[in-house]
Design a protein with these regions (language model features):
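A donor-sugar binding/catalytic signature common to diverse glycosyltransferases
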Residues: 129-172
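Short gly/pro/ser/thr-enriched loop/turn and capping motifs at secondary-structure boundaries
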Residues: 1-6, 111-112, 167-170
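A nucleotide-sugar donor-handling region in carbohydrate enzymes
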Residues: 1-87
Length: 230
């Protein structure tokens, strides 16, 4: 976070105290773990893949989640997550016109799930965990943020990502997505204003990437367990 806050110093000098405090705090650590994507590579005790909450993404669980949502197995489902981009209203009319696709919209419903044609509005406290929603879908549209990136990476499904260039960490995250994930870059303007059909067709044609059984979370857990066994 000290690195992330640095660009704000010119307009907000008060960040200097926060940056100094964080650097001092970090320097007291006995061990250093970095998880991909890494913005500032350094000497570490463990380098790990992206860390996401575990998913119950076996075939049976994926089918069960889709059945719970009311999605048929043959339907192409796109999860849309736009948290963190203030004031963004989803282009629902454009989504409705993409009749060959269904759109899963977490946090966009009221207290209960609502289905409107090919739009599936889910409440914020949806009973299905977010990693399992992603694993049950065929692709994701979303802004570039660590948790979304890590969960899509874990699922291995295509990602149409919207980079927030005004955030310092966005470029390293986008570079990682381009290199390690089936993906298409997408501007916020294109998402909100342009026809989505062609982009979605190209997105869903990208091959999935199978991930190994050892996740970033399991690697870190094993490392910490090793420390506790001393």
């Amino acid at each position: 976070w000290d690195w992330i806050y640095q660009p704000y110093l010119a307009s907000h000098p008060e960040f200097a105290e926060i940056i100094s405090y964080l650097r001092e705090l970090y320097s007291q650590a006995d061990f250093h773990i970095q998880a991909e994507p890494v913005c500032v590579p350094g000497k570490v005790d463990l380098a790990a893949p992206p860390i996401a909450r575990a998913t119950r993404a076996c075939r049976q669980e994926r089918t069960a989640v889709r059945q719970q949502l009311g999605l048929r197995e043959e339907q192409q489902a796109i999860l849309v997550t736009m948290g963190g981009i203030a004031g963004t209203e989803l282009p629902l009319a454009k989504m409705r016109s993409c009749e060959n696709f269904c759109f899963v919209l977490p946090g966009q419903g009221g207290k209960e799930m609502k289905v409107d044609g090919n739009l599936f509005f889910l409440p914020s406290d949806c009973a299905v965990r977010h990693p399992d929603l992603i694993a049950a879908c065929d692709a994701v549209i979303g802004k570039v943020g660590y948790s979304t990136l890590a969960e899509v990476y874990q699922a291995g499904i295509p990602f149409a990502y919207i980079s927030r260039e005004w955030f310092r960490e966005s470029r390293p995250l986008a570079d990682f997505i381009d290199r390690e994930m089936p993906s298409l870059p997408l501007t916020e303007e294109a998402f909100l204003q342009q026809d989505l059909s062609d982009m979605l067709t190209r997105l869903c044609q990208l091959p999935r990437r199978e991930r190994g059984k050892e996740s970033g979370a399991s690697m870190v857990a094993a490392f910490l367990q090793g420390l506790l066994s001393f």
